[in-house]
Amino acid sequence: MLKLNNIEFYNTPSGGVMVSVEGQEAFILLPTHYDLISILHDYIMQNYHGAYLALSSLYKGSAQNPSYYRYRIVSRFARCNFGEYETNVVDISKHTFHFEQVHCPLRGTGDCQLEKVVCNPQYTLPLTKQQINIFRMYADRLNTEQIAQRLSLSTNTIDRHRSDIQSKLNLHSITEMILFWTNNNLK
């Protein structure tokens, strides 16, 4: 089974998307790469819901052909977020997306309706508002006691929320929580 780990993407001059998976020869992403497209499509849909909705609306004309429809969504997402060839940090490692500032002639002009929706999208957290608030405080380097004091809750309640956050996001420490917050540009 394909895993979202050690994958690098980059745009070709002709507009294609090259994919380099560790241990494999690089290839151009095509609609026939069902396994990779399927796992990326599902991950985008679950974790970058705003970007997914925008792209699914943009490509709704292709929805009658599901594999091509998913390919178009994944290809555009990759072109807008992983298009630069980067040798220092892979684009996807351990189910974490490392977005790049892809050069785009439309960036900052107001001409692209998908700017800041698809490119560098906001991560969709499967957390309650209270959990997000507590997560944000940990990311701001507050400790459990400080968070409990600010929210007028017991440290046991804060620990329970932290445990729930870590469980939902498959994180194992406060350090991993902070890295996750930072890597996903959460606010």
Predicted regions: what is each one?
Residues 1-115:
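DNA-contacting interfaces and partner/effector-binding or oligomerization modules
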Residues 35-37, 45-46, 120-122, 145, ...:
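Generic alpha-helical propensity signal that fires on short helical segments
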Residues 93-95, 151, 170-171:
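Alpha-helical interaction segments
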Residues 117-157, 183:
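Helix-turn-helix DNA-binding segment
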Residues 161-164:
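Residues within the DNA-recognition helix of helix-turn-helix
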Residues 166-187:
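Basic, Lys/Arg-enriched C-terminal extension of HTH/homeodomain DNA-binding domains
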